[in-house]
Amino acid sequence: MKLIAIVGTNAKQSYNRILLQFMKRHFVQKADIDIMEIANVPMFNETEDQTDLPAIQNFNTKISQADGVIIATPEHNHTIPSSLNSLLEWLSFKVHPLDGKPLMIVGASYDVQGSSRAQLHLRQILDAPGVNAAVMPGSEFLLGRAHQAFDEAGNLKSEATVDFLESCFFKFLRFVQVANQLNEPEEVSFEAGTYQVTTQGHNGKLPMTVTLSEEKIEKIDIDSSGESSGIADIVFTRIPNEILEGQTLNVDAVSGASVTSNGVLDGVARAIKLAGGNPDVLRKRPKAPSALDKEDKTYSTDVVIVGGGGAGLAAAARVLQAGKQVMVLEKFPALGGNTVRSGGLLNAADPEWQKTFPANPGEAHNLSELIQTDEDSIAAEYLADFKELKQQVTNYLKDPSYLFDSNILHRIQTYIGGKRTDRNGCEVYGNYDLVKVLTDKDLDSVHWLADIGVDFDRSEVSMPVGALWRRSHKPKQPMGYAFIEALDTYIRKNSGTILTDTAVTDFILENGLIKGVLAKGRNGQTITVHAQAVVLASGGFGANTKMLQQYNTYWSNIDDNIQTTNSPAITGDGIRLGQSIGAALVGMGFSQMMPVSDPNTGAIFSGLQVPPANFVMVNQEGKRFVDEYGSRDTLSKAAIDNGGLFYLIADENIKATAMNTSNEKIEEQVAAGTLYRADTLESLAEQIGVDPATLVETINNYNSYVEAGYDPEFDKGAFDLKVEKAPFYATPRKPATHHTMGGLKIDTQAHVIKEDGNKIPSLYAAGEVTGGIHAGNRLGGNALADIFTFGRIAAETAVTECC
């Protein structure tokens, strides 16, 4: 019988290790006991997945292959050591080798009671659903006063103690035999037919149709129309394919889409129950063969792109347009990164188009205030542009009936919008050369994307929260998936290679020069890519709370439990890669919060997300508290100062301007209590717990400001609609981490710059992995302009210099 024995401490001197070594010798005729140490297992950190580390994979493999497991634990503060707890966290996070595995607990400690309380706690952990070990009931071996229990040879001195240990161990051997019989695969049969079930997806109900024969799951059809395009698409192919291939429900959830993944698995399980089958039998079956591929692979290409979001895919498409080979490596199962989670609004001044639209009330006043800015407060490198802008606006104000814009207005707003001072008194603003490239070439990015296949809606000029001006170009297809779908299609049609589930870990260096990258595949296999150039486009670190806290110099506090709008993939990998070869960092202390995020999930597209000109924000007293047209950090700080939670108030007309929803979704959210609706403002106030008279007064005042085109309370930058037509809505909102402005230092050609100021040969970067453009605060809509503009530039420079 093959047993794994785990020393439950990383201490160099341990009586639990001595106990297991004694058991290995004493029971050598009964079992082959392999003792494993946990010293090299990292502390568990959910935001930095290290499941693929050899130390963790070694435990996963050996435990999976063993007949049973013994854990020897000491007792620290009435519980198990943190190092042992970390191991169990890793072994129940992405891999689950202890599921159903027969397990025996032993323990040694200095105290007379042995490790009784630690063993009790350990048993509770092992019984948890994510671990689900088959712990032997009853018999526990507790070795008290362990420092007196062994002789110099490491043998137990007391015959009675040895007898008790033998009794426990022999019971465990019998327990292993019985428990493993229960783990043997069972046959399952179904009542053949087609079964309709409804399960829960990320965005709501997920209808499914499952077809079963008497012995097999034959077909799985999913109505995914209610889910966000791009984010969960991989779920609707991978999960059903692996279920059908292996005839198993032992399928891993897709990273970044675990709610929808588990919804699909639950839906199939419900269908199996309806057909008279037992889904638990299928949960114990092996994974599908395709899910177990561990073969190392090696590739060669001209340019390798690290990251499959908007910046990475734009760079890849541009490499292909230059006639070169490209590979995109994306660590998550699906492409898209933060781009697919964005609102799809791309800032670019397009005056000829914009002037065909009328100005909104307050916009001319906004420009008048801007050009009155004291020139002494403008940085020297921006001053000439500011003076030219003053002349442009002065001429415009002679007839301010239409929507004005220019590259220079965009540049100055990006500069002023990003100009911030941190808690240490350090003032930052965007690098002029980088901001100039952004605002001069962003319209080229719009035209380039249209040529790639993105269909833009030219019927209106859009504006996201914190943008400061209406200049956003919006695809007809909702949100950011339009960009990802078009670029993905272009890359695949033009023979580009995309590998998902491929996390880059290191550069390949030859004589100090970058010659490609090393990566880990889905099952820990090594992926080697030789290339002439590397483009880092892996995003920022908005989903890595510890890293945010480490670098933060702007916010007074970043809470451990803060929500994020980001993909879980956005954890700073590319920044750390750059640091590993001496890349300089810039602006790392500044992160941005999205003020209008879901209080429970951090999502930005629940409730009613409308243009800022239609924002009416009220606090928990029913009062407005900020200029809703302001920058994101201004809105977030104001919200935090007002308790965090606030409400966006809308009426039927404002609801029609929402860019993120449908009537069906609205009904579901109202029913779920995550969106409030009422026929009167008084009734709405009661639902959200504010004084009705206060809310009515607030809205009446706001409506009068819309009529006047001026807000005497908060000087709102622009207005559109009044709040006057029932039904009325309240969307709960709370700030969540959204964007990190800092990252790798680059120049205007997207070279990554070393700490000594020199370029790193063959290394380029684009998008949120870089810093220097947005400084202390990013304008809404500038992220997409950034990634598509500098993604193209990075590719062009890489091809010109290296290929």
UniProtKB/Swiss-Prot annotation:
It is an enzyme of class 1 (oxidoreductase). The gene is urdA. This is Urocanate reductase. FAD binds at A311, E330, N338, T339, G343, G344, D573, H739, E768, A783, L784. The active site is at R632. It catalyses: dihydrourocanate + A = urocanate + AH2. Belongs to the FAD-dependent oxidoreductase 2 family. FRD/SDH subfamily. Coiled coil: none annotated. GO terms for cellular component: membrane. It comes from Streptococcus mutans serotype c (strain ATCC 700610 / UA159). Keywords: FAD, Flavoprotein, FMN, Oxidoreductase, Phosphoprotein.
